[in-house]
UniProtKB/Swiss-Prot annotation:
Domain comment, as recorded: The N-terminal domain determines nucleotide recognition and specific binding, while the C-terminal domain determines the specific binding to the target protein.
Enzyme Commission code(s) on record: 2.7.7.77
Organism: Haemophilus influenzae (strain ATCC 51907 / DSM 11121 / KW20 / Rd)
One GO CC term, this protein: cytoplasm
Principal location: cytoplasm
Binding annotation for Mg(2+): 99
Record note on quaternary structure: Monomer.
Function field: Transfers a GMP moiety from GTP to Mo-molybdopterin (Mo-MPT) cofactor (Moco or molybdenum cofactor) to form Mo-molybdopterin guanine dinucleotide (Mo-MGD) cofactor.
SUPFAM superfamilies xref list: Nucleotide-diphospho-sugar transferases (SSF53448)
Protein known as: Molybdenum cofactor guanylyltransferase
Cofactor(s) essential for the protein: Mg(2+)
Superkingdom in the source lineage: Bacteria
Length: 192
């Protein structure tokens, strides 16, 4: 089965635990978090977009299309995912958050191998400790189900995935890690 895939970096949140600062634009080392994400994604996939609900001019400077959620009021990652699924011309979208700069360099390959089965519409990352559903490969075939799920008031990402046959794909620490940065202190403590 040949499928087309694009990638979307989710940078549309409120970042409450970061004092409202736009996470993707915060500096880690000498680069913004979004630059770290782009640098890890580009060897894996060429067609990248950024989902951001503020500071769109800043995000556009990285040279990729930027779009905001169609649903108002920062309704969480599923809102950005729905907008992406509605806009894409690809069969699947690889989603990553903007605050997890050390994710595996084989993320796409491993998730793609899980969706080779025509019935698998979502594959998401996990490691030895827990699931990481924001790192996922999702089929556009799910956009109607996702629209209805959000309209019902639900926002739980992992629940949506499990209800729709999502498959977890295990990654080892050697492949990369899913440590994310939620506070400015987290960023200051990390040396790269």
């Amino acid at each position: 089965m040949t499928i087309t895939i694009s990638a979307v970096i989710l940078a549309g949140g409120k970042a409450r635990r970061m004092g409202g600062q736009d996470k993707g634009l915060q500096i880690l080392g000498k680069q913004s978090l979004i630059e770290h994400i782009i640098n890890r994604l580009q060897p894996q996939i060429h067609q990248i977009s950024i989902n951001a609900n503020r500071n769109q001019t800043e995000y556009a400077k990285f040279g990729f299309p930027v779009f905001s959620d169609e649903l108002p009021d920062f309704q969480g990652p599923l809102s950005g995912m729905l907008t992406a699924l509605e806009k894409t011309k690809s069969d699947f979208i690889l989603f990553t958050p903007c605050d997890t700069p050390f994710f595996p360099m084989n993320l796409l390959d491993k998730l793609k191998s899980a969706v080779k089965n025509d019935r698998t519409l979502i594959a998401y990352a996990c490691d030895e400790e827990r699931e990481h559903p924001v790192f996922c490969l999702m089929s556009v075939q799910l956009k109607e189900k996702l629209r209805h799920y959000l309209a019902s008031g639900e926002r739980r990402l992992l629940q949506f995935m499990k209800e729709n046959g999502g498959i977890s794909v295990k990654f080892t620490q050697e492949e990369g890690n899913f440590e994310n940065f939620n506070t400015l202190d987290d960023l200051k403590k990390t040396v790269i």
